Design a protein with these regions (language model features):
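Bacterial N-terminal signal peptides that target proteins for export
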Residues: 1-11
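Short stretches within intrinsically disordered, low-complexity N-terminal or propeptide regions
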Residues: 6, 14-15, 263
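C-terminal segment of classical bacterial N-terminal signal peptides
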Residues: 14-23
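Extracytoplasmic copper-binding redox domains, predominantly the cupredoxin/blue-copper superfamily
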Residues: 23-264
Length: 264
């Protein structure tokens, strides 16, 4: 009897080991952000700003035409996909994520702030590094002067976060993002160079790591979202006048939920 029992337990153990084991860590949200409107841009003249002969060297030639520098506020693909929209789960507060967040990194490169859109975390670092120097200009050999100026924006009001000049290539700043009065829920963070007005960036505050920035065709994917029903927003600083559009998404363990996020 003892021998038979041992055999049964042995077979069960082998079966357990052989059985496939799948460990899920939430699900995914993927889809596309679309915009009902058209692409829009503002136009500047390089000649009206410092370093015109350097700024025109930006390798992204879609940003310029001769002396004209375009600030592309809204970029829409042929099928309506909206580039640069931020998609974020907003009903999860992940203290482990916010505590460990290393900060938002932005670079000034060929007179352009990159990335154009992204996220920030309240009371965490916002970093800007100057990558620009002009070997053809004796005054700018060591660096092209950029003056990153940040704003906390809530509705029609805005307040300065920092205003610091970065004179040399390699110069950096590291300042905390500070939202007050509910701006962390309703507002966003804006960056502009006081030397070159066409250098701007826009960043949505988040409280968890479940976010994505839409690609050129508007597509996005957010992985590892906890299973359950969630509130998800799609936001773009200029489309729909910067208003967040909210969606309900049901995420299943190990599954992928599709979201068609239209901004009108």
């Amino acid at each position: 009897m003892k021998s038979a029992l041992s055999v049964i337990l042995g077979v069960a153990a082998v079966a357990f080991v052989a059985a496939p084991f799948t460990a899920f860590a939430g699900g995914s949200i993927s889809g596309k952000v679309t915009f009902a409107g058209k692409s829009e841009q503002k136009e500047f003249s390089f000649a009206k700003f410092p370093n015109p002969k350097f700024c025109v060297k930006n390798p992204n030639k879609a940003l310029m035409d001769g002396d004209k520098r375009f600030f592309k506020t809204i970029e829409v693909a042929k099928d309506g996909g909206l580039k640069g929209a931020v998609v974020a789960v907003v009903d999860v507060e992940d203290k482990a994520f916010t505590d460990a967040y290393a900060g938002t990194d932005v670079v000034a490169e060929f007179c352009e702030f990159l990335p154009f859109t992204g996220v920030v975390v309240n009371n965490k670092s916002f970093k800007v590094e100057n990558h620009d120097a002009d070997a053809d200009d004796p005054k700018s050999v060591q660096g092209v002067l950029h003056n990153p100026h940040s704003f906390v924006v809530k509705g029609s009001s805005s307040a300065t976060g920092f205003n610091i000049g970065l004179a040399k290539k390699g110069d950096k700043l590291d300042k905390p993002v500070v939202f007050r009065g509910g701006a962390e829920k309703e507002g966003f963070y804006r960056l502009q160079c006081d030397q070159h007005e066409f250098m701007q960036g826009f960043y949505l505050p988040v409280t968890n790591g479940y976010f994505a920035v839409a690609k050129e065709d508007g597509s996005f994917e957010i992985k590892g979202v906890p299973a359950g029903k969630h509130k998800v927003v799609a936001w773009h600083p200029f489309a729909a006048k910067g208003k967040k559009v909210e969606f309900d998404v049901d995420v299943t363990e190990g599954g992928t939920s599709t979201l068609k996020a239209e901004i009108k």
